[in-house]
Design a protein with these regions (language model features):
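Glycoside hydrolase catalytic-domain context in secreted enzymes
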Residues: 1-388, 409-844, 853-917
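Short beta-strand elements
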Residues: 388-412
């Protein structure tokens, strides 16, 4: 197998291993797990039949060749026997209570209707050895969780299910197929013997869960979030979900930083917690190695009877002085190899002190806007979760300025933020007055004198025949503006069905041999809306729970090869936002409440992608901590909380990945939309962290001028802030779609700024696979491996193509369509922006009791289901409405039952679309 060949068996094995290592065992009374050889297993819960491989939105829309659910994997396991009679009862009920796909984007149910457990079911399973209760939850992009039954909380039917099954079976295991933590008070009330967080494990997820249940893999996952008694116990809850402003009053006291400092009694399961089928001992010492480093030495021993892995976690406690600090901060971790019973492993971690430095944003230490080490005693704790970590050593520290920075993104007005008072009492103090406005420090780089076309091509820069500046000098002002604009979604200029094309998109730019770059949605796999298959990865939270950077690195090396195979230059991921609150619907994409763990896991993903010569786009920069009104709701945060919590994970990934591409958010931070924030995109990223890649907006992002509302036409402020690529437009050549040319002509956007951004983009291009294709320098080995790759995907080149007429309408005949159950009709539609009515005219010879659903997808997003019934040979028409943007779209019609004849479908344009859909 060649270097660039994608070994799907290895890919699946790595994903399966990650899925298993990310499972977190919270409870296992009387060694209920692992299942014993010969056990007869009763499986309860309808979600056994509907596995959630990922959360909702762009991060989950991966077309897979297969998905292994938990029940699928259990059925394939020869060491146990399933109660098929009980399974049959569920299957019969599900026929009358089908899976509810919801109404489309942002309108999908958080959970599915659960089958009420009956005495008949309990009697059927009465002779079984063990019961598995499988529950599921989903949420995602544009769809936060809510503190309601069926979302964050269990429904009454689910509670009744656990209560009755736990009462009958001494060995009851509750398995949570969820993207995020949920309310867990029911564990104490109903007392099931075992509880397992299985998360959302991608297409190999069911196999991973089965491996843990059967003992093939000893559970070794650890919580990346604190599970508290009640949602109201999280200090962010009272300031989460507002439609206009969310004050981050908890400041740096996020997750365990809050609970371990102020509210230990509110914790059900602490950060870093997770059980094993064996036991371990940890002996550790810590001491100051030098003025920059702390050295931790530990011995982890398997003191039980089964082989297993353990996670060593290191926390620092800073002295409490003029600058308040949490009582614990994660500063290091390591996962052991699999240790046999009685075996031990010696681990040495050298931890830079700047890992646990504190940020002074007020000058209370005499050093405003600095990371500092405080005078006093620093204590190091080592253990297997934040609560069980024991003191391993301490050392005296003199006051030290670690890094002098500058104020960024400061709140417009002071607000009260949480502080730690003597005696670990909660206090509040105002954030400092800001010094700089958002535009006070915007630089206007000197322009490069334009030369016009001198015959140089980008390949000449690659070959070091000319400088990048000499090349960019050839580009006209219009070229520079067009280079700023990406196109999508589903641009025909790059891999079909992907999120965007950018760089060489226009004839004038292509003249200079600038290739079109391809970006695909992630992070849970490659999204290609034309139907091309890709590998669905475990979600971000699950990967974080592995605490295994090397495993994640190896997994994403395979994803990097898959990107190259599909000619995708960057995957839009990993997601590195903080789990500020459990109700954020997009937490499944992100990793943890802790920034250090988030950054290390993000860096591991990037390192894997980079090994394969691909890369990822870390997102969403920064503070995308709720989906409700994400385009408008202002995140009001202190500079200290930004620097220590919400930016830190990005910083680690930028420096250690390294990252080459960053995506900003939709919304504002402290009154300034991040897409146009010079503080974030230039000062923090490039000056403070040394980032040299590209920054792109989120899709159809907006910006503003401070004190003014946002506007989708305001793009010039983005370019001035060094946000290099606007995502996305229908046509990069359209000079009337935004304010770029107008602001350039006014002098508010300079040629030097556009040239600077162009250099950023083109430096990215030079390191991409697309550039190798442009120069015809892809190695013969890679070309051979691509040619030999198995393909069972739709042939996009042969897909039906239709273009809207002058009125924006499209009509497609249904002659010859195969509409048998499970069949699909695919088409490439070139549509205008606006509100469409889709009309579908069909007939059926069946009687009116026949149910004949047709589900309509556009770009892999469900737009609705037409619920036809038998019409006894009469033609009938149904309609659905939706909005869309201008450009190419991939339509799929899925026929849920056999029996329809289609006359035609028609798309009729009725009005302009809101681009913030």
């Amino acid at each position: 197998m060649g270097r660039y060949a994608l070994d799907m068996e290895k890919y699946a094995d790595l994903a399966r291993t990650a899925s298993a290592e990310g499972c977190v065992l919270l409870k296992n009374d009387n060694s209920t797990l692992p299942l014993k050889k010969g056990d007869k297993v009763a499986v309860f819960g309808r979600m056994a039949f509907h596995y959630y491989k990922s959360g909702l939105g762009s991060g989950g829309l991966v077309n897979t060749r297969y998905v292994v659910g938990i029940l699928d994997a259990l059925r394939a396991c020869k060491d146990i026997a399933l109660d098929e009679e009980l399974i049959g009862i569920y299957e019969k009920w599900i026929k009358d209570h089908p899976y509810d796909e919801g109404e489309g984007w942002g309108l999908v149910p958080w959970s599915q209707e659960e089958m009420p457990v009956t005495e008949e079911m309990l009697q059927t399973a009465s002779g079984d050895d063990v019961a598995l209760v499988i529950l599921g939850r989903t949420a995602g992009e544009d769809q936060d969780n809510t503190d309601k039954l069926g979302s964050y909380k269990l429904t009454r039917t689910e509670e009744d299910l656990i209560r009755k099954v736990s009462s009958q079976f001494s060995r009851t295991v509750v398995i949570l197929n969820v993207g995020n933590i949920i309310d867990m008070k029911w564990v104490r009330e109903f007392d099931p013997a075992a509880v397992l967080y299985a998360w959302q494990g991608g297409q190999e997820g069911g196999n991973g869960v089965c491996d843990v249940l059967t003992g093939r893999v000893n559970p070794c996952g650890k919580l990346t979030d604190t599970i508290a008694e009640d949602i109201s116990d999280y200090p962010s809850t009272s300031n989460f979900g507002d439609l206009q402003k969310n004050y981050y009053k908890e400041d740096i006291y996020v997750g365990y930083r809050y609970f371990e400092t102020f509210a230990k009694d509110k914790v059900l399961y602490p950060f870093g917690f997770g059980l094993s089928y064996t036991s371990f001992s940890v002996q550790a010492s810590a001491e100051e190695k030098d003025e920059h480093t702390v050295c931790v030495k530990a011995t982890v021993k398997n003191t039980g009877t089964k082989p297993g892995k353990e996670v060593l976690e290191v926390y620092a406690k800073a002295p409490q002085g003029v600058l308040d600090t949490p009582v614990r901060v994660l500063c290091g971790f390591a996962k052991t190899k699999e240790l046999a019973a009685g075996e031990e492993e010696h681990i040495t971690l050298e931890i830079p002190k700047n890992t646990f430095a504190s940020y002074d944003d007020s000058g209370v230490t005499g050093h405003r806007d600095c990371f500092v080490l405080l005078e006093g005693t620093y204590t190091i704790y080592v253990g297997t979760d934040v609560r069980m970590a024991q003191k391993a050593g301490s050392y005296p520290q003199t006051f030290t300025v670690i890094e002098q920075l500058e104020e960024v993104c400061a709140p417009q007005k002071p607000f009260a933020r949480m502080t730690r008072k003597p005696g670990d009492v909660i206090g509040y103090s105002d954030t400092p007055e800001r010094i700089y406005g958002p535009y006070d420090r915007v630089e206007k780089p000197a322009e490069i004198s334009q030369t016009g076309d001198k015959g140089y091509r980008l390949e000449d820069v690659y070959d070091k025949k000319i400088s990048m500046e000499t090349f960019v000098a050839q580009l006209s002002d219009e070229d520079l503006i067009m280079l700023f604009r990406g196109e999508g979604m589903c641009s025909p200029k790059v891999t079909p069905g992907t999120a965007a094309a950018f760089a060489g998109l226009t004839p004038s730019l292509r003249k200079f041999r600038i290739p079109a770059e391809c970006a695909s949605d992630g992070p849970s796999g490659i999204r290609m809306d034309c139907g091309t298959k890709a590998f669905s990865l475990p979600n971000g939270t699950l990967l974080g729970c592995t605490f295994n950077c090397e495993l994640v690195r190896q997994l994403y090396e395979m994803t990097g090869l898959e990107l190259r195979l599909n000619r995708v230059d960057t995957l839009l991921g990993p997601g590195l936002n903080i789990h500020r609150n459990p109700l954020n619907g997009r937490n499944f994409e992100y990793i943890s409440e802790d920034p250090f763990l988030t950054g290390k896991m993000g860096a591991a993903q990037l390192q894997g992608l980079n090994i394969a010569g691909s890369t990822g786009t870390i997102k969403h920069f920064a503070a995308n901590n709720q989906e409700t009104k994400r385009h408008e709701a202002d995140s009001i945060i202190s500079v200290r909380a930004l620097r220590e919590i919400y930016l830190k994970g990005f910083e680690i990934a930028v420096k250690e990945g390294p990252a080459r591409s960053v995506m900003t958010t939709y919304g504002p931070v402290n009154g300034v939309w991040t897409a146009g924030s010079y503080d974030l995109n230039t000062i923090v990223l490039r000056k403070d962290w040394g980032f040299s890649g590209i920054v792109m907006t989120d899709w159809w992002a907006k910006a503003n001028h401070e004190g003014q509302p946002s506007d989708p036409r305001i793009h010039a402020v983005m370019a001035a802030a060094q946000n290099d690529v606007y995502m996305v437009t229908a046509d990069a050549q359209d000079m009337q779609q935004d304010d770029m040319l107008e602001e350039f002509q006014k002098g508010n956007l300079t040629r030097g700024q556009l040239q600077r951004n162009a250099i950023n983009i083109l430096q990215f291009v030079l390191k991409s696979p697309a550039m190798l294709y442009e120069m015809n320098r892809i190695s013969p080995e890679e070309l051979k491996d691509r040619k030999n790759a198995a393909k069972d995907d739709p042939d996009v080149s042969k897909m039906m193509k239709f273009m809207a007429d002058e009125q924006g309408n499209i009509r497609i005949s249904g002659d010859g369509w195969d509409t048998h159950q499970g069949k699909e009709i695919l088409a490439d539609l070139d549509m205008k922006a606006g509100s469409y009515e889709l009309q579908m005219k069909v007939k059926s010879n069946l009687d009116d009791l026949a149910q004949l659903p047709v589900t309509v997808y556009l770009d892999n997003i469900i737009k609705g289901t037409l619920s036809f019934r038998g019409s006894k040979g009469q033609w009938v028409t149904q309609q659905i409405r939706f909005d869309t943007f201008e450009g190419h779209h991939y339509m799929k019609l899925y026929f849920g039952a056999t029996g329809l004849t289609v006359d035609h479908i028609a798309f009729q344009l009725s009005g302009g679309a809101d681009k913030e859909q």
